[in-house]
């Protein structure tokens, strides 16, 4: 079953301030515009057989945020299933200014059945959250990655 599922990979950037914080992106596009809880995600995306999951995670981080992932050692947080995909995520300690993010874009027909393509940002904002706050914001299928990060 897993072999037939789409695969996605991403990087959960974290930093230590007065507490452990993680960087999440609010999903872009009209479906997510007015949603908050469950509308934030690890920067991630799909990949094929032509790259490793780690390569895909680094590529997707840069595509979604417009900045390369900070230098450092990726620590695998394992896999989780969500939205018909198997998601592999790595933790990376580093810092990033959310104001420096220039997200990539995607196109979709909007309004529906209009025949018109419109461009939307992959993520419409990026923010640091405490793990507790992030747990309430993140897509539920990705919550295990927060739990695994704090268990380390």
Functional labels for PLM-detected ranges:
Residues 2-41, 90:
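N-terminal strand-loop-strand
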Residues 41-75, 130:
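The catalytic Nudix box helix
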Residues 78-115, 127, 149:
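Active-site-adjacent beta-strand/loop module that shapes the phosphate/pyrophosphate-binding cleft
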């Amino acid at each position: 079953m897993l072999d037939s599922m789409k695969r996605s990979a991403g990087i959960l950037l974290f930093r230590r301030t007065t507490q452990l914080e993680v960087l999440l992106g609010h999903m872009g596009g009209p479906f997510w515009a007015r949603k908050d809880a469950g509308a934030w995600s690890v920067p991630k995306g799909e990949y094929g057989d032509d790259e490793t999951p780690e390569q895909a995670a680094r590529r997707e981080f840069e595509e979604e945020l417009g900045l390369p992932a900070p230098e450092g050692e990726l620590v695998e947080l394992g896999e989780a299933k969500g939205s018909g995909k198997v998601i592999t995520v790595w933790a990376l300690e580093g810092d990033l200014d959310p104001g420096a993010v220039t997200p990539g874009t995607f196109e979709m027909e909007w309004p529906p059945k209009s025949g018109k393509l419109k461009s939307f940002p992959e993520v419409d904002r990026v923010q640091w959250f405490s793990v507790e706050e992030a747990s309430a914001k993140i897509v539920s299928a990705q919550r295990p990655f927060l739990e695994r990060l704090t268990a380390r």
